[in-house]
Amino acid sequence: MEKNVTLKNCIPEISPLMRVGKVDKRVLGPVLMGFFIMGFCDMVAPITGRIALEFPASRQAAVSFLPTMVFLWFLVLSTPLAALMNRIGRKATALIGYAFTVVGLMVPYVAGEGCALGWYFAGFGLLGVGNTAIQVAINPLLATIVPGERMTSYLTVGQIFRNTSLLLLAPIVTALVALTGSWRLLLPIYAGLTVLGGIWLQATSVAEPPRSDRAAGMADCFRLLGNPTVLLCTLGVACFIAGDVGIGFLSVRLIDNPDSILTTTGFYACRIVGTLVGAWVLVRVSDVKYLRWNMAGALALCAALLLVRGETAVYAAVGLTGFAMACVFATFYAVATKAVPEKANEVAGLMILAISAGAVSGPVCGAIVRWSGDAHWGMLFVALCVGYMLWASFKLKIKQ
């Protein structure tokens, strides 16, 4: 009797629909909207800079744990949610994620201006639960409607939609502050968009594939860590997520300016450009070699952000870091899968669990900033993450 908790439905698998050369564009729209909604949880790291202004210095250590409340749930709930999805399906799991997202966004808003920090923890915790369900469901839901040979390109499109939601964060917050004096209307706006996305998905018929007779279990996933390539790539994804969240946490603190959140806009705008450029380059250059180039550049940019203080230089360095980090997740994921192609489900399970590494970024970066009194020193944590990824890129073998 299989006792391992199953992960099969959190992994893209080849379904009869995927073998068809055409994409059902009627279904594609609401699924890509899911990627857009997926990006809402990533606003927590940069928005903590605004929340921190509402609390005294004695509470700043607690505020820095807010991003942890989102990413912790990837570690705790990814497996149970995958098991639930085995029973109720991918679309239903995504809709449950939308519901938790709406409630999580509205809790601190309904609590009101100047609410206790606990309301933010409760709201962002629920937001993390919802986002875990969305992450578990949306990628494989996309896999049911696109042909297998085009999965990579459509997953890239999905990431562009996710990054676009982050790109719009700073302009929306800046406009809200100018019009209302507060950023907090962002929460019901995001909640409303999530409701619309849920209605759109619910109204769309999605033919999900039949269940597989054999599901990947947790023991199967962790057993793969004995493969050096899979281990390097799993830790690479963990460092990528941790570094990415760290940049989001620090970007609004690197410039002492009310418009400092615009550094987040530059970061994600350049990431979108980097994703598009990477999609073109990776057809012509080895993925590992491209990873080496980008991580070398990213490490140099981290060093620059430790030293530079001019606003223009900070904007440029943060933006270029976003460009360099654009294709990292896809590269580690692809290299690990190619190392053990017969264990693709187990590899993907490890990657989902690795996302939980983002939970450490806020507390660690916050502690460094409080210890040093300078947000730029928080880039030491990001540099450590990038340094590992650069080292791993040289340990990985280039497949011709």
Name each region found by the language model:
Residues 149, 157-209:
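Helix-loop-helix hairpin linking two adjacent transmembrane segments in secondary transporters
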Residues 65-83, 265-278:
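Central cavity-lining transmembrane alpha-helices of secondary-active solute carriers
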Residues 117-133, 313-327:
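Hydrophobic core of transmembrane alpha-helices in multi-pass small-molecule transporters
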Residues 123-160:
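Cytoplasmic helix-loop-helix junction between adjacent transmembrane helices
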Residues 26-57, 139, 247-252:
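Extracytoplasmic
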Residues 133-147, 326-341:
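Intracellular juxtamembrane helix-capping segments at the cytosolic ends
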Residues 99-114, 297-309:
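C-terminal ends and interior cores of transmembrane alpha-helices
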Residues 44-45, 227-272:
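Extracytoplasmic gate region of multi-pass secondary transporters
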